């Protein structure tokens, strides 16, 4: 089972349970339209064999995030978040050159960012999620501290050049993640998110040393 930010499509006969009060009718419509939910971090409240999911509604519906639980066995399909190159054609026309510039810089560093948040949901649903103040939320698979430092520099320069805010996380080894802005800071400890919890870890623990085979 994939972790946080993964996209899941439920079976038509899935027996999911709404956690957000009153959300069941809207969730029924959502899944009937063939739309996915996103995997949320486990908090220990879900039943064995089940997963916490979220459905973020567009601004026209108050940007409410609907929470639900579903059995893992009721998942018909599960994929990684959309890549930036897949999202770019669905973004507002004025923003597309900025995203293309970021994509080119990422490729130059052998990085392939994934997208979550408003830009991703607009591409997935065809509904209007992106507005003038929308941030670009990105997930960056990173394997080494050298890659992380290069990425921080890349993102800082891109924001300065284009005026669009890029939020998101560095996806670290062992299914951990850290906010890239926090990583760019000077604190000796950073907040690390996993599929099950959040905890403070020293920077030195983010990239475990791997012995040669």
Curated annotation (Swiss-Prot):
InterPro entries: Holo-ACP_synthase, MdcG_C, MdcG_N. Keywords: Nucleotidyltransferase, Transferase. One of its GO terms (molecular function) is nucleotidyltransferase activity. The active site is at residues 135, 137. It catalyses: apo-[malonate decarboxylase ACP] + 2'-(5''-triphospho-alpha-D-ribosyl)-3'-dephospho-CoA = holo-[malonate decarboxylase ACP] + diphosphate. The keyword Nucleotidyltransferase applies. Disulfide bonds: none annotated. Signal peptide: none annotated. The keyword Acyltransferase does not apply. Its EC number is 2.7.7.66. It is an enzyme of class 2 (transferase). Belongs to the MdcG family. Transfers 2'-(5-triphosphoribosyl)-3'-dephosphocoenzyme-A to the apo-[acyl-carrier-protein] of the malonate decarboxylase to yield holo-[acyl-carrier-protein]. This is Phosphoribosyl-dephospho-CoA transferase. It comes from Xanthomonas euvesicatoria pv. vesicatoria (strain 85-10). The gene is mdcG.
